[in-house]
Amino acid sequence: MSIKLSAGALASLPANIAVPKYRRSDLSAGIIHFGVGNFHRAHQAVYLDDLFNSGAGHDWAVIGAGVRAADELVREKLGEQDWLTTVAEQEATSTKARVIGSMIDFIPPGDAAATLDALARPEIRIVSLTITEGGYYISPATQTFDSAHPDIVFDSRNIDAPKTVFGLIVAGLARRRKAGLAPFTVMSCDNIPGNGHVTENAVAGLAELVDPELAAWIRRDVAFPNSMVDRITPATTDRERRMLHDSFGLDDNWPVFCEEFRQWVLEDKFPPGRPALEKVGVTFTSDVAPWEWMKIRILNGGHASIAYPAALLDIHFVHEAMQDAQISAFLEILTKVEIIPTVPPPPGVDLDSYRDLIARRFANPKIGDTIERLCFGGADRQPKFILPVAADRLKSGARVQGLALVSALWCRYCHGETESGKTIAPNDPIWERIHAAARRARQDPGAFLEMRDIFGALADDPIYVAAFSEALLSLWARGVRPTLGKYLSDHGVAA
């Protein structure tokens, strides 16, 4: 017999499920979080839960918020269980379950008035974001704020009823400024290099369109700390719900399954105050950049490197890709030869050891992370995780054969079928465009590089163009395995 998760059921849960040690009625809100997806609930919410369990920080509970239609479903499902979430931490030989209680409310998505009222509350001192890499209105090629985007233009003309996260933040800050309240800190927790700077440019950039004086105040008085976040967290499916039911006798509308490993490095820049997260393992520093580059280039770049060859070979799970000798060897050589040389090591970190840790995490068979998830949104992810590494290599006169091959594999994937002929379902917000470019590129590889908002100056670099073209033509003429084999043999590895 199973138990349905709710606040009233906590005392009845089996002993092998950890529950909050604090009284949730003692919590009060200090944070509004936009984007209450799986990653937030497996990461920031867990760290806060740890802090609350220690007896500290009870005035830093989370209120959820969102602007997408999908956020309403999350609110509905979490509301049915009193905003509680079950987090199942999985290693190869064990699974541990715990109930997280750090969120205490969720503003109805689409209710701009209620959201703005909440943002104006003096006790709200942090607004945090996990809105995905593609949610920041940044031009992929220039990495600058896209002030001409229709959503941004709309908000600039309707700032009292905005429809974007940034419109709500700007309007909320304007209210606080008018009321003489200190501004809240805006904390991005997305996988973007310099995510604090990117967020500041989006918020201040929109404010500039509304009120230049407000924009100047934001740039002067609002803090946007940079951060590095890390925890592999797959999407939730019925598979995970069944596993929780079968293994723990608990029914959760939207549980989160993740790896045991987690890491959070934060720039210590919170003028209105912050929770004492250093007590529960968060690293605070004055310079997050080395940690960001390490994680984004080695882990996220590694994900991109195995995703597309695995997808084209009909491999479903990430751990299965790591069991493929050729794909795992490609990841190892590419990371050692082309990626790590572009990464300045954080203090006290050995990058080769970090790479080995990443490989072990990818190989965890319990996680159930899918290749489809890693392939999603390549048009946003390639310009953040792969193309800048290639650009840095070219600036130093180094070779980019492996990095160009990763992007060629993405192009081949975007053509829309695997090597066995199976159809690849659209898997990118701009799928129609990249699919059309990939089809043209089968005969003319340069046609894919013509998407200059993605490839930027690389599209005009003859060395990169030649490497990309050679890789793509080989993928079509010879196939994935011979092309990977050629790269490996060029580096002395038997394929």
What are the functions of these language-model segments?
Residues 1-495:
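Substrate/ligand-engaging "lid" and interaction regions
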